[in-house]
């Protein structure tokens, strides 16, 4: 491989864009693509705005490079309408692009491919319940190698709680929480407009609001009541999605897969989640679960269990690089 000695040696700049709207695959960033993503910033003001700022910098600093956008929502384009549609006025929903999109798709694409290889099956033959558990957390039901359902929705706020996100709550809660929820947040800028409601539920909630820390390893390793409560809440919500997706997949599940910083590193979290879902046919092997995990995919479940329990060390950057290399037009130019 040739050594990179200057900015002129960089041929492709690959960007992770959280919200891709209706885009179902990675895109070369043209002026039209950029403007379309700007419009989507209203749906993901806390994510797309910053990412587009980086894209703009790369366009200026790397004029000879091709910029490619990889979307965290693109993996979920296969979610069927009865799952992605919200029961609201359809005309308003279509006009404002209001539906479930889902996120962490780059991670789930990597997990699907890696787990299929581990199980020695074609990816389009694999059913699994995958958990991307980190400071941002989500779950995904993967059917025949495609996203069937996922816990995040219109935005990454829906679903599981995170370090500073509330996850799914009664939508009216925020109106009782503060009187100024509809106003612009002080964190808003000329190019980034977020409401107080978005700021409260995205930045001032989650397990940090309960414990004062965003470090889940501290929470998992403590017996303090506030830490135990946060741990139990997270386990409860994760198990709820596992149960829901198990039914949605009609019990045809090849594996339960843990990924993300917490999913990969917290043996206690994995053990407790699997214990709580043992009625579905999952069981942990304590020795496997407690050892250091070094491979991309490793087994932590019991050989006597009905379903496999795996840990996947996901790699979103590698998935982005793979997506870029598979775009033939970049190499034919």
Question: Whereabouts are the PLM-identified features?
Answer:
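Phosphate/pyrophosphate-binding loops at sites that engage ATP/ADP/AMP, CoA/4′-phosphopantetheine
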Residues: 1-11, 117-122, 242-254
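General beta-strand structural signal in soluble alpha/beta enzymes
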Residues: 15, 45-49, 66-71, 77, ...
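Glycine-rich beta-strand-to-loop/alpha-helix junction loops that act as flexible
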Residues: 16-18, 133-135, 256-265
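Adenine-nucleotide phosphate-binding core of ATP-dependent small-molecule kinases
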Residues: 186-190, 199, 203-250
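Catalytic phosphate/nucleotide-handling subdomain of diverse soluble enzymes
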Residues: 142-184, 193, 199, 260-293, ...
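Internal helix-turn-beta structural module
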Residues: 228, 232-257, 263-333
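Glycine-rich phosphate-binding loop of actin/hexokinase-like ATP-binding domains
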Residues: 75-180
């Amino acid at each position: 491989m040739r050594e990179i000695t200057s900015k002129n040696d960089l041929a492709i700049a690959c960007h992770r864009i959280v919200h891709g709207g209706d885009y179902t695959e990675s895109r070369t960033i043209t002026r039209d693509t950029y403007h379309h993503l700007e419009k989507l910033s209203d749906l993901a003001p806390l994510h797309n705005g910053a990412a587009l700022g980086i894209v703009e910098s790369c366009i200026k600093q790397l004029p000879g490079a091709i910029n490619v956008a990889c979307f965290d929502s693109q993996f979920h384009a296969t979610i069927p309408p009865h799952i992605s549609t919200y029961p609201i006025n359809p005309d308003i929903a279509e006009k404002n692009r209001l539906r479930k999109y889902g996120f962490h798709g780059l991670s789930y694409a990597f997990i699907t491919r890696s787990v299929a290889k581990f199980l020695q099956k074609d990816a389009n033959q694999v059913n699994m319940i995958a958990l991307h558990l980190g400071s941002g957390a989500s779950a995904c039901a993967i059917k025949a190698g495609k996203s069937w359902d996922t816990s995040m929705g219109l935005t990454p706020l829906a679903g599981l709680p995170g370090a500073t996100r509330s996850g799914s709550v009664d939508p009216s809660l925020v109106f009782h929480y503060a009187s100024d929820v509809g106003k612009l947040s002080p964190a808003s800028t000329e190019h980034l407009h977020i409401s107080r409601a978005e700021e409260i539920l995205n930045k001032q909630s989650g397990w940090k609001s309960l414990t004062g820390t965003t470090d889940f390893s501290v929470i998992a390793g403590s017996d303090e009541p506030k830490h135990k409560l946060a741990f139990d809440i997270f386990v409860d919500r994760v198990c709820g999605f596992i149960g829901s997706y198990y039914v949605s997949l009609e019990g045809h599940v090849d594996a339960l897969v843990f990924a993300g910083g917490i999913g990969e590193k917290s043996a206690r979290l994995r053990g407790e989640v699997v214990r709580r879902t043992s009625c579905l046919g999952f069981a942990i092997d304590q020795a496997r679960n407690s050892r250091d995990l070094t491979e991309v995919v490793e087994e932590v479940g019991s050989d006597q269990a009905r379903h496999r329990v795996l840990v996947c060390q996901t790699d979103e950057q590698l998935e982005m690089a793979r997506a870029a290399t598979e775009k033939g037009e970049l190499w034919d130019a």
